[in-house]
Amino acid sequence: MTEPVPVPSLPPPPPGDRPPGIQVSGVHAAYGRIEVLHGVDLTVAAGSVFALLGPNGGGKSTLLKVIGGQLRPTRGSVTLGDQPVGRRSVERLARTGLCSIPEGRGVFPNLTVRENLRMWTYRGHLSMRTVEERTYAAFPRLSERRRQLAGSMSGGEQQMLAISRALVTDPSVLLLDELSMGLAPLIVGELYELVAGLSGQGMTILLVEQFVSAALAVADRAAILVHGRIEQEGEPRRMAEAALGAYLSG
């Protein structure tokens, strides 16, 4: 009897050949009478990292809120995979595989590290043991801080704790707002290594970032949002110089 010939596993297709993980179509959004987004179109391939760049006040965080269901667009639509965001609540979107980590990190400062993790087990339907194993394997230093109040930790450690939500709930779509804000470059590099690893496991990641070099190091594609409009989109290397010009003029 002959041995079966092993079939080599194929590498994942490039981002341009994958179905959309996030589809934004003609989105307008406003705060009261002030329109902030003006007909934004954006496609993020499933399992890829997409960096959204641009100066402050350009609408980046607003777009994340629309995608995450925190702000309803005045016109246009958003789809996550094959699920329209529509009028779904943030909680319902979380159950369909969305995890959003806002600017400011989104941890519970008056709870310990371990208590924060326990709060997130309810969403992921995982045992506390599994949650701790996943978190401490990714961030060993959090194991040493597990009885410490989250609000008393450094900014980098708080961001690590925030990102552990993505490890706990295993979402299909992850939104990251200003991951590197206020952090040392060494910590930023460590966090983005994890982001790249999550994408390699099939997670679709959209990140808003001002730390351009760190974001473009892990991104498959990038776009520049200025005054509520996508001005340019393309490969990360091409976007680096364009992003610098946008910051200087924005």
Regions found by a protein language model. Give the residues of each.
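The feature captures the beta-strand-to-loop junction immediately N-terminal to the Walker
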Residues: 53-55
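Helix-to-loop junction immediately C-terminal to a conserved catalytic motif
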Residues: 68
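Conserved ABC transporter NBD signature motif
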Residues: 76-84, 96, 128-130, 137, ...
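Conserved ABC ATPase signature
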Residues: 149-153, 157
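ABC ATPase C-loop
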Residues: 166-167
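Conserved catalytic motifs of ABC-family nucleotide-binding domains
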Residues: 170
